[in-house]
């Protein structure tokens, strides 16, 4: 009985470890001046006057917020827990999925909350974006098109376009591989 229990615990621990990302081994795009990575948690001082902003009627583009990423190919589910000591309007922290400088989306919150879970599910040429307040019940906020079979950069991101900076905390980041739907369907039809 004990052997089975130890094997089950080891298998569960190995599975959890394999699905989690090691933040220490990820790459920075616009590394912040001050951050720590410890026990699977990233705490960063988000620099002032940083943002991700695409071309609009305002006439400028900005691409200088801190973004810690891993490159992921194929179909996947990415999830992260985000919190921030937001100070002024437009302070932001979340998860970015990036192919190149092109698109972004926002969840508007009417009141401050202690934390938020974000989840992205990539299937074929679509990415579904979800949020949750408890990591149990997720609400879809958007579906977007993304060319399939191209690698994407995925990870925690923050920006402070208006203020003097703030502290953001990211934890429980993991990317789980999902089987390619076309291959699964082909295998089922060609047995």
What are these regions (language model features)?
Residues 1-21:
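Bacterial Sec-dependent N-terminal signal peptides
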Residues 21-191:
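Extracellular glycan-recognition regions
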């Amino acid at each position: 009985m004990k052997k089975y229990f130890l094997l089950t615990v080891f298998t569960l621990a190995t599975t959890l470890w394999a699905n989690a990302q090691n933040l220490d081994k990820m790459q920075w795009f616009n590394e912040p001046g001050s951050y720590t990575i410890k026990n699977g948690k990233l705490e960063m001082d988000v620099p002032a006057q940083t943002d991700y902003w695409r071309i609009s009627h305002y006439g400028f583009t900005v691409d200088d917020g801190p973004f810690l990423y891993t490159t992921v190919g194929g179909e996947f589910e990415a999830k992260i827990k985000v919190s921030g000591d937001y100070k002024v309007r437009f302070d932001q922290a979340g998860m970015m999925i990036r192919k190149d400088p092109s698109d972004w989306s926002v969840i508007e919150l009417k009141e401050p909350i202690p934390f938020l879970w974000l989840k992205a599910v990539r299937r074929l040429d679509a990415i579904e974006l979800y949020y949750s307040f408890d990591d149990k019940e997720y609400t879809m906020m958007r579906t977007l098109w993304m060319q399939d079979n191209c690698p994407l950069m995925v990870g925690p991101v923050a920006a402070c376009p208006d203020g003097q900076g703030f502290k953001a905390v990211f934890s429980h980041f993991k990317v789980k591989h999902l089987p390619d739907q076309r291959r699964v369907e082909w295998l089922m039809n060609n047995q």
